[in-house]
């Protein structure tokens, strides 16, 4: 090939590689950065805990140096997390983790956590103290913020066991479709399914348990007979 033609081919190839590099960089997931200050602990450890299945589970930790700490990572969706200096603490200071650069100031002994740089945390901070008050209506939050991850979180955490089936379905129908695949909305769907399964007139959920002789007995195998089922809590 003539030298001029070869140069043209090299330039085209280089431009293609450069374009692919730019595109791949643009597709990189944006992560979160938490820059924290803690006023009641100078040095030690701080634990990041994820709210899951009605409890907080430690997923990361950072060293506290001269009252400051830092977390970095990527989250797949905005979810509730907690911060604590006690690894086994069941009541960390709660905030919403999103892929943003956030500034945190905390004092665990006084139960104070302020978060700046995240709009979702502004909404969480506004509503967290209200949802525990008598007379708070979750309907108003759903009506005003149907697309915020904060809304289904409060439904799951504070209202799932207070609402009947029709009330839960009504709230679910008002949530924005963009939340359909998120963790908290999936949990709401699970609550609705379980409530539907135990409505009067519905077929009872099947289960198998050993009888007094240790033989397995399945509820569906007793269909057509009079059956008395006695349930009690595991801690009784």
Regions found by a protein language model. Name each.
Residues 25-145:
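A non-transmembrane, solvent-exposed segment enriched in polar/low-complexity residues
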Residues 1-36:
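Bacterial Sec-dependent N-terminal signal peptides
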Residues 218-236:
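Short active-site neighborhood of thiol/selenol oxidoreductases, capturing the structured segment around
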Residues 132-135, 162-169:
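Helix-turn-helix repeat elements of alpha-solenoid scaffolds
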Residues 145-148, 161, 178-185:
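Short solvent-exposed coil/turn linkers within tandem alpha-helical repeat scaffolds
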Residues 138, 167-175, 203-206:
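Alpha-helical repeat scaffolds
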Residues 140, 186-220:
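N-terminal "domain-start" segment that seeds a small globular fold
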């Amino acid at each position: 090939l003539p030298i001029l033609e070869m140069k043209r081919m090299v330039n085209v190839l280089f431009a293609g590689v450069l374009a692919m590099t730019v595109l791949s960089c643009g597709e990189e997931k944006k992560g979160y950065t938490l820059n924290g200050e803690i006023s009641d602990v100078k040095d030690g450890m701080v634990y990041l805990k994820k709210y899951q299945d009605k409890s907080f589970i430690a997923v990361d930790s950072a060293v506290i140096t001269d009252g400051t700490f830092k977390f970095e990572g990527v989250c797949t969706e905005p979810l509730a997390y907690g911060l604590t200096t006690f690894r086994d603490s069941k009541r960390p200071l709660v905030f919403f983790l999103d892929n943003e650069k956030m500034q945190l100031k905390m004092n665990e002994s006084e139960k104070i956590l302020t978060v700046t740089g995240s709009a979702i945390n502004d909404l969480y901070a506004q509503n967290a103290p209200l949802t525990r008050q008598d007379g708070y209506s979750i309907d108003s939050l759903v009506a005003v913020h149907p697309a915020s991850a904060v809304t289904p979180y409060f439904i799951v955490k504070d209202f799932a066991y207070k609402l009947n089936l029709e009330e839960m379905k009504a709230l679910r129908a008002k949530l924005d479709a963009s939340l359909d695949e998120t963790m908290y909305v999936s949990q709401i769907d699970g609550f609705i399914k379980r409530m539907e399964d135990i409505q009067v007139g519905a077929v009872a959920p099947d289960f198998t348990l050993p009888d007094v002789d240790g033989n397995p007995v399945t509820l569906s195998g007793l269909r057509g007979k009079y059956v008395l089922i006695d349930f009690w809590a595991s801690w009784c």
